[in-house]
Amino acid sequence: MSFLSERTKGYIIMKKILYLTDLSYKAKGRNYSEEDIYITDKLKNKYDVVLCHPKCAVSYEDYADIVVFRNTGSVIGYKDIYFDFLKRVSEKKLKTFNSFDGKADMKGKQYLLELTAEKYPVIPTIDSVDDISILPKSDLFVIKPKDGADSIGLDFVTLEEINGRNICPGTMLIQPAIDFQYEVSFYFIDDKFEYALYAPDKSKRWILKEYNCTDEDIAFARRFIEWNTVTHGIQRVDACRTNDGELLLVELEDLNPYLSILDVNEKIRHKFLNDMMETLEML
């Protein structure tokens, strides 16, 4: 039984792509379904593409040449299914985009502690109150679940409140509350810088505009791409610009970063999709 229609019979056979997405996933200011429909509409000009939820991937992945893991939402909602999928990727040597060999968000938030210890320009992060001396002095701190996503469970607290919560070591991330000018995100395919977007209004962080970054800004973001071990795929470097003008890493999303691709101009989109397809052709 064919994975797709027989429309390619007698013609050049297209690569078959299983595009994993959750078209019903809701997030404030982000239209996951619209973005993935746009991308797959472009991909179908060169590939046979089928979209499905990660929960259904096992039924189709053996028939695909490449499995593209995109806007699937937080894997916390289907953790066992996700880990079973990763096991099959390893055992069957499935070709995937992204590759699942990164050490940032796809492995959890431990990397923020590692980058802090390695003195990278990152918001200082600990996961135990016993290490509070590592952090710069602050009147207010941010705490959030170490295995959380989408700001679920995030809270702003004082040091006194932290000490009164009996936080179990290793369960919560603790950071100083950083006063910043704006947030900015840098988007890469493999090691290629694609574009940058920023939120000029801190109270409306989901409203993004194209950001004209400097060579120094790109070099900042590239440090984290080079630190990471993703062989191929899309990565998003999220940072904040402090009031002193310094960039600090907020998050390195290397699993399924939302791209805000519809917020950039057509020329940037065209280059992004061409670079994405160039990588897919090499798999």
What kind of region is each of these model predictions?
Residues 3-13:
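Short, Lys/Arg-enriched N-terminal segments with co-localized hydrophobic residues
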Residues 14-18:
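Extreme N-terminal starter segment of soluble prokaryotic enzymes
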Residues 23-124, 128:
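Conserved N-proximal alpha/beta basic substrate-recognition cap immediately N-terminal to
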Residues 56-63, 132-137, 163-165:
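Short amphipathic alpha-helix with an adjacent loop that forms part of the alpha/beta core around
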Residues 64-69, 144, 186-188, 195, ...:
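A short beta-strand motif that forms the metal-chelation/ATP-contact edge
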Residues 138-158:
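Conserved anion/nucleotide-ligand pocket segment
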Residues 152-234, 238-248:
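Phosphate-binding site of ATP-dependent enzymes
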Residues 241-283:
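C-terminal active-site "lid" helix and adjoining low-complexity regulatory extension at the edge
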